Structure formats: structure tokens, C-alpha cells
From Swiss-Prot:
This is ATP synthase subunit b. Belongs to the ATPase B chain family. Coiled coil: none annotated. It comes from Mycobacterium sp. (strain KMS). The chain crosses the membrane at residues 26-46. InterPro entries: ATP_synth_B-like_membr_sf, ATP_synth_b/b'su_bac/chlpt, ATP_synth_F0_bsu_bac, ATP_synthase_B_chain. It is a single-pass membrane protein. Pfam families: ATP-synt_B (PF00430). GO terms for molecular function: proton-transporting ATP synthase activity, rotational mechanism; proton-transporting ATPase activity, rotational mechanism.
Length: 169
């Protein structure tokens, strides 16, 4: 019977309960865990949640602002392209108008220069014609004297006195 009593003693020392059934330590640890969980839920989670919500709101607002800015940029770019196209058309019209006016001025100056040149040419022709007639008249009047002088030199006789007496008759 000695063997049986050692077996019973060994069974009593090794713990007599089922390990699946909780004992008092488990309930104490569970109570501490629930208290810590309550403290975290009451004082730690709300500020973190608030910061996360503010951050999410800020990100949402930033995305919305970026979308609005992109829309405004696209609208401004479209407007600027329209304004630039209008300005280019106006500049092209002004250039064409200036070219037309330049051509008119150039043709006007050419016609003035041509008229002035024609007037100067006519004036010069008239002056040359008058000078030619005057020179011809001078030569006509001096031809008689020159021919008498030349004849007297060639013949050696003074013809100017003979010519004067023959004209006087």
C-alpha cells in the first residue's frame, strides 16, 4: 500500500484541477487588462481620433483646393489663349494696314518725285533751248565778222571795209 499512497500524494501535489478551467489569477489579470483598455479608450484614443479626423479634413480640403486651382488654371489658360489669338489677329490687321499705308505713301512719293523730275527736266530743256537760241543768235551775229576776218587773213586784203561799203549801198 505504500505505492498507492505515494501515487495519491503525487497527484495532490501536481495540481488537482483542470488547466482549461480559469483560476483566480486569470480573473485578476483580466480585470487589470479591462481597466487599462478603458483608460486607453477614454484618454488616449479620442485625441488621436481627433487629430486623424482633422488631418483627413485637411487632406480633403487640399484635394478640393487643388481641383479648384486646376480648373481655374485651365480656365485662365483658355482665356489667355483666346486673348493671345485676338491680339495676334489685331496685330496682323495693324501690320496689313500699315503695309497698305506704306505702299500708298511710297506710290505718292514716287508720283511726286516723278512729277518733280518731269518739271525739272522740262525746265532744264526750256533753259537749254533758250540758251541754244541765244547762242545761235550770238553766233549768227558774229559769223559775219568772223567770215570777214577769215577772208581778209586768207586773201590778205581788208574785206571788212569793202563789205561795209557794199552793205551801205
Amino acid at each position: 500500500m505504500g505505492d498507492l499512497s505515494t501515487t495519491i500524494l503525487a497527484a495532490e501535489e501536481g495540481g488537482g484541477g483542470n488547466f482549461l478551467v480559469p483560476n483566480g489569477t486569470f480573473f485578476f489579470v483580466l480585470l487589470i487588462f479591462l481597466i487599462v483598455l478603458g483608460v486607453i479608450a477614454k484618454w488616449v484614443v479620442p485625441p488621436i481620433s481627433k487629430v486623424l479626423q482633422e488631418r483627413e479634413a485637411m487632406v480633403t480640403k487640399t484635394v478640393e483646393d487643388n481641383r479648384k486651382a486646376a480648373d481655374l488654371f485651365a480656365a485662365a489658360q483658355g482665356d489667355s489663349q483666346q486673348v493671345m489669338a485676338k491680339a495676334r489677329r489685331e496685330a496682323s490687321g495693324i501690320r496689313d494696314e500699315a503695309r497698305g499705308e506704306g505702299r500708298k505713301i511710297l506710290e505718292d512719293m514716287r508720283s511726286r518725285a516723278s512729277a518733280e523730275s518731269a518739271a525739272t527736266l522740262q525746265k532744264t530743256n526750256e533753259e537749254l533751248s533758250r540758251q541754244g537760241q541765244q547762242t545761235a543768235a550770238e553766233l549768227q551775229s558774229s559769223i559775219e565778222t568772223l567770215s570777214a576776218t577769215l577772208a581778209s587773213r586768207v586773201l590778205g586784203v581788208d574785206i571788212s571795209s569793202a563789205a561795209a561799203t557794199s552793205q551801205g549801198r
